[in-house]
Amino acid sequence: MVWWTSYLILRCVSTTNLIDLTFYSLSLSGDWRQTLPVVPKGYKLDIIAVCVTKSSFWHAVNHLRLTVNMRVHNRDDSCSQAQRLQATAFADWLISVGDGLLHDPENETVVLPEDLLLPPGRKTIPQLIESVYKDLDVGRTEAQQIQYLCNRAILAARNRDVDDLNSAILHRMTSDMHIFPSADSSVDPSGTGMPSNTLFPSEFLNSINISGFPLHRLSLKIGCPIMLLRNLDPAAGLCNGTRLVVSQLSRWVIEAVIMTGPHAGKRSFIPCIPLSLSDNSRLPFNLQPLQFPVRLAFAMSINKVQGQSIRHLGLYLIEEIFSHGQLYVALSRAENKADVSILLNDTNAGLHGMTRNVVYQDVLQTV
């Protein structure tokens, strides 16, 4: 049995009876330089404490290390020797970023290479968008639009920045805007199932914006990319994190085409469904909106793109990263250094290209 992305597994898995190391062999695969399990409102020690490295069976794990960078190894034969050397150097630099070898450990900062940054005079959000989504509104066939969008994304650390970027990019498309408001309700969490809308009016419920949930006012256009937020039909490729391109819109159903993966090109139908938010929401009620389980995907949060490759990559670092591995994950989505465009401020200690890089050496040293 192989378990991918083991760095996201909570240590509590060891409390189950699913793993018997005496009789079974379990392969755990993952890169511990990437982001770790999310602990709402948790601090460094809280996050480290829930990692699988703190499990009771970790002492029995035999560590094997991969040594060949497949992105470099699989580069097209048409690439010159100089391009291959550049790709190798970029891959080595990414490893150093992930290991925290390049940054100031006191301030958790690193200075990014000049050629990754937007040039002086172009350090604006519109220029970042233009560097990634140039010719966005050029007329294309559906297949061409899918090919264009699947290779592009702008990443940000915080969801509010992702929402702002998505809205700005969507308005660059000249096709008709369709707005789908959710029907929000709340239920008493005591278990009675009684509605609590009298205490929490719909205007307040509509204003709640929580990670992993669709927006109250979902704005979409035909030809825009979306990301699925729920597992609707994993066997058909409709999983949490699946990216699709909208082909048709109606009040209760979105028709969209899957962009990547083994189901790429498959036409799917996404219904408007009742959702529920209760566990760990820190709300005094259970939020139950009726909405399409999707968000725009021109821009995405860094934590959502682990495992994906992006050919034309933009990074919005005006708001710096805040957790272990986020900078490494963001930078390593690109295969080519020339395909990365980074927007950040030069206000940190007056140094050009300086940004935050959080690396938990306590975790890396255990693997």
Question: Residue spans of the language-model regions?
Answer:
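RecA-like helicase/translocase P-loop NTPase motor core
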Residues: 1-367
